[in-house]
Amino acid sequence: MTAKNVFISIDMEGIAGVSHGQQVARGSDDYPACRTLMANEANAAVEGAFAAGAERVLVNDSHGDMRNLRPHEIDERAELLIGGPKVPQGMMQGCDGAFDVAMFLGYHASAGTEAAIMDHTYSGAAIYDLRINGESYGEGDLNAALAGSYGVPVGLVAGDDKFCGQMDKRLPGVRTIQVKEALGRWNSISIHPNRACKLIREAAADVVAECATEPFRPEPPYVVEMDVINAAMADMCQLAGHTTRTGARSLRYETDDIRDVVRQKTLWTTLAATALR
C-alpha cells in the first residue's frame, strides 16, 4: 500500500560530505555550504516520495537550533517544520498517527560509538549515555520508538556506516543509505553528495511504494537511565519530578509510556544545560 503521508526528520552530522563539527556549527565558514547539502538530501527524499504517490510530506529540521533549512531551498510541495524549541517531541515534533511512514536523514551514531562521525545522543554537552531497560539508545532508536507509539514505521534511514549498522539491528527490514564510512569522530570517506541524493531519492520512492518495516514498539515498562557529563548536571537534573539519582552522574526514571521517556529526557537535558558554566 502506498504511503500517502510521509514524515522526514533530518539532522546534519550524517549528511554526505560532512565530517567535522565546523561544518555543522552556525557562524563557521563551512556552515552555509552544509545547509545546502542538507537541503539537497531533504529534497531528494521529498522528490522520491511524491514520485511514488505520496500526498503529504512534512520535513522537520532536526539539527541544533532547528533553523538550518532555508525555506526557499526546499521543494515547494513539502511542508517545513523549522525553529525551536520543539516541545515536547523535538526531532519528532509533528509526527503522529496521521503519518504512514517516517524517514531519518543525516543521522549519526549514538554517544560512545567507536569511529563514528560526531557520535552523540541528543546533547553532546550533557548526555554521556542514555539507556532504556539496560540498553543504550541513540537518537535513531528513541525517535523510532516514539514514531512507533503512533503506529508509524521508520522505512528509510541515511547516515554513516556506524549509524546504519545500529539501525539495521534495531529495525529489521529498514532501508539504509550509507553515505559515508566513518574513520574517526572527525573524518570519513564520503560518496559524492549528488550520488547520495540519487540513492535517497530512489530509496524514498521504494519505501513509499512499500514499507518493509513494522513500527518499533519496545515492550514496557521502561526503566530509563541517563548518565550526564558531570555531577553538577546531575545536581540540577535530580530536581525533576520522579527522578532517582543513582550515582554522581546517573539518573533513573520509570514509566509505561515511551512518550514520557522523551519528555523526561528533554527535561533532564534542559536542566543539565543550566550547569554549563
Question: Where do the model's predicted regions map?
Answer:
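Short beta-strand segments
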Residues: 9-10, 60-61, 102-107, 157-158, ...
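Active-site rim beta-loop-alpha module in soluble metabolic enzymes
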Residues: 146-154, 158-208
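N-terminal glycine-rich anion-binding loops that anchor highly charged ligand groups
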Residues: 6-24, 34, 38
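C-terminal accessory domains and tails appended to enzymatic cores
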Residues: 196-277
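Active-site glycine-rich loop that binds ribose-phosphate moieties when present
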Residues: 124-150, 158-162
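Glycine-rich loop at the start of a catalytic domain that most often binds anionic cofactors/ligands
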Residues: 64-77
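A glycine-rich helix N-cap at a beta->alpha junction
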Residues: 75-95
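Alpha/propeptide regions of enzymes that mature by internal proteolysis
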Residues: 15, 29, 33-60, 66, ...
